[in-house]
């Protein structure tokens, strides 16, 4: 879902293969992405602005500062479960979406 925001309202079907090249680097094949508009650019902009605030000054800000700062436009969402037994973050830039989860096999309070 977060890729739609990064792509300004367009859903692009993911591909595990970016491209196929020969030994000299010439591109032999690239996937033709399936693109579908699912949000207006304005709706995507609003979501990006809200999710960027999580990184700029919200609940993810401490992690950004603790790691020397992150100087790229990025957005994301933090979360915790009841009793703080799991914590997670889903973040994105224009190029990548990633998720991080921290928890235990058996419910145990982290914080």
Predicted features along the sequence, with ranges:
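A penicillin-recognizing enzyme superfamily signal
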Residues: 2-111
């Amino acid at each position: 879902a977060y890729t739609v925001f990064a792509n300004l309202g367009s859903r692009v079907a993911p591909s595990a293969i970016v491209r196929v090249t020969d030994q000299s680097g010439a591109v032999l094949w690239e996937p033709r992405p399936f693109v579908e508009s699912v949000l207006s650019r304005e709706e995507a902009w609003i979501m990006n602005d809200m999710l960027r605030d999580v990184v700029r000054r919200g609940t993810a800000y401490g992690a950004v500062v603790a790691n020397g700062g992150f100087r790229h436009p990025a957005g994301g969402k933090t979360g915790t479960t009841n009793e703080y037994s799991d914590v997670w973050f889903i973040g994105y830039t224009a190029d990548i979406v990633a998720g991080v989860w921290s928890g235990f096999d058996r419910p145990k309070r982290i914080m």
